């Protein structure tokens, strides 16, 4: 997919508009920026799991709420559907939380792992970058990292869910295969940075994760 100059301009306009809203401190303006049809319902503070047959998916501050699709316009609902299917195909349960204290995907994923009864979690940013993590690893380490969000497809997200479930069962699966495109980074770099800035606007430092229910 080609990223047009107009798409970049639109993203810049949205980012600048969000900055202006934050500066104004107006809750009315902030609430108006939320699109109808949020993907999740927030149901209270997240709790640490006790089931060893679960995988926790942690989404970024804007995922499914202020942003609705990845950098290549894979709908967030599709991403969650595929990951859920992958986990369930391995016979495991799934829980969702939202991390608002950071927009760094490594730390989002590590929070997922810490809240998961199995110790395995998946973290995903709104632009699509994804990490499979284990609670005993340091945040900047991981089990699998998927940094090139423009190359992640429906099939990839499903495979990520399956592998996370396999790790939770104590298996050592082969890493999820991904496409490799040396031009993806320069092609999408500006848009990726802008989308990350947009998500970072909704970070509330020192807040704890929220439990989510898929609508």
Please place each PLM-identified region on the residue numbering.
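Structural signal for hydrophobic packing residues in well-ordered secondary-structure cores
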Residues: 12-23, 83-91, 116, 164-172
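Glycine-rich, charged/polar anion/phosphate-binding loops
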Residues: 39-44, 106-109
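Glycine-rich phosphate/diphosphate-binding loop of Rossmann-like nucleotide-binding domains
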Residues: 43-91
């Amino acid at each position: 997919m080609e990223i047009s100059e107009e798409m970049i301009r639109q993203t810049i306009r949205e980012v600048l508009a969000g900055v202006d809203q934050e500066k104004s401190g107006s809750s009315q303006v902030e609430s108006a920026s939320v699109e109808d049809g949020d993907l999740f319902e927030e149901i209270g503070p997240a709790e640490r799991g006790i089931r060893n047959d679960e995988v926790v998916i942690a989404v970024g501050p804007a995922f499914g709420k202020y942003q609705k699709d990845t950098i290549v316009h894979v709908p967030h609902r599709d991403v969650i559907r595929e990951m859920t299917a992958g986990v369930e195909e391995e016979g495991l349960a799934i829980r969702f939380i939202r991390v608002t204290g950071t927009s760094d995907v490594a730390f989002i994923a590590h929070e997922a792992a810490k809240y998961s009864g199995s110790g395995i979690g998946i973290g995903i940013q709104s632009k699509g970058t994804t990490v499979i993590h284990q609670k005993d690893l340091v945040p900047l380490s991981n089990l699998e990292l998927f940094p090139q969000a423009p190359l992640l497809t429906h099939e990839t997200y499903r495979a990520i869910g399956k592998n996370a479930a396999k790790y939770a069962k104590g298996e050592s699966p082969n890493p999820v295969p991904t496409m490799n495109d040396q031009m993806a980074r320069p092609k999408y770099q500006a848009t990726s940075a802008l989308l990350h800035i947009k998500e970072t606007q909704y970070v509330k430092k020192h807040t704890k994760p929220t439990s989510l229910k898929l609508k």
